[in-house]
Amino acid sequence: IVRDYRYRGYSARETIARLDSVERGANRWIAPFQEEADVMFNSSLLFELAALKRHAEPILDEVPKYCDEYTTAHRLKKYLSYFESIPENEIPPTSFLREFVGGSSFRY
């Protein structure tokens, strides 16, 4: 949601509306072949939800209560409420997470 908003111009509502399609694509084109890959890389970070929280919450707040995507946005905000935000300067500039929140030392 954060990356789509920041770099693709999608609202949280638009991204949430696409989640079923993304999952279908992953189930069709990724999951059946992942065990055949030479290498699998888990890019999750222990601090990623704490780092994404400050970026995601205002984007999720933009989802109107009257639309179908509101329930998911509300659920995600509730989930994020269990994490404490970390300061932006505590995310290393070389962190993969910078692809989502900006400020990467890499240029592409």
Per-segment meaning from a language model:
Residues 1-108:
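Conserved NTP phosphate-binding and transfer environment spanning the P-loop NTPase/kinase superfamily
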